[in-house]
Swiss-Prot record:
Belongs to the NGF-beta family. It comes from the Eukaryota. Disulfide bonds join C127-C194. This is Neurotrophic factor BDNF precursor form. The keyword Glycoprotein applies. Residues 6-114 form a propeptide. It comes from Loxocemus bicolor. The gene is BDNF. Keywords: Cleavage on pair of basic residues, Disulfide bond, Glycoprotein, Growth factor, Secreted, Signal. InterPro entries: Brain-der_neurotrophic_factor, Cystine-knot_cytokine, Nerve_growth_factor-like, Nerve_growth_factor-rel, Nerve_growth_factor_CS.
């Protein structure tokens, strides 16, 4: 992930993996609305609905814990996805994790912070970043939690065939403020730098003894 700098000499951020999320379904449309005022009220209502759904998902995420009987529950990660093709959108768990981290950092209730969201105030990120899905064909190897180099398996066997492992990587942008310093930091008093940090995700790998298993690796 791309480190978001602050007016201090060093900042360390470590992400946390998510385990599971419930289903998501929304109802309602704008076809029955009439007039600009009704449309505005309708759009506001839909926005509140989506925010309410996010709040419910985050509440559910606090409750859900992997049971001993469900040994696969801890194999889910916010930055890893098994799919037959390249995912078209960022992982939902990752978006929920980012939103939750923002709320936690604010140390305020969701409903209070909802109306002071940076996106609503037109704020810019301290560091620009880019995110993309990559496969094991591009990663080849990685380092696990014990410091050993393991081979990242490109395909994962499933009952009806094989699925590819995709990793959602976020890096600091090579353009803009990555080299010039962080946005919003007074250069007269502070030295700042945007740099890409690593986080652990769980992936299917093989060690040097040909043992295949799910391990935490750095991406």
């Amino acid at each position: 992930s791309c480190m978001k700098a602050a007016p201090m000499k060093e900042v360390s951020i470590r992400g946390q993996g998510s385990l599971a999320y419930p289903g998501l379904r929304t109802q309602g449309n704008l076809e029955t609305l009439s007039g600009p005022n009704d449309a505005t009220r309708g759009l506001t209502s839909l926005a509140d609905t989506f925010e309410h759904v996010i709040e419910e998902l985050l509440d559910e995420q606090q409750v859900i814990q992997p049971s001993k009987e469900n040994k696969d529950a801890d194999l889910y990660s916010s930055r890893v996805m098994l799919s037959s093709q390249v995912p078209l959108e960022p992982p939902l768990l990752f978006l929920l994790e980012e939103y939750k981290n923002y709320l936690d950092a604010a140390n305020m209730s969701m409903r209070v912070r909802r109306h002071s969201d940076p996106a609503r105030r037109g704020e810019l990120s301290v560091c620009d970043s880019t995110s993309e899905w990559v496969t094991a064909a591009e990663k080849k190897t990685a380092v696990d939690m014990s410091g050993a180099t393991v081979t990242v398996l490109e395909k994962v066997p499933v009952p009806k065939g094989q699925l590819k492992q995709y990793f959602y990587e976020t890096k600091c942008s090579s353009k803009g403020y990555a080299k010039e310093g962080c946005r919003g930091i007074d250069k007269r008093y502070w030295n700042s730098q945007c740099r890409t940090t690593q986080s652990y995700v769980r992936a299917l790998t093989m060690d040097n003894k040909k043992r295949v298993g799910w391990r935490f690796i750095r991406i």
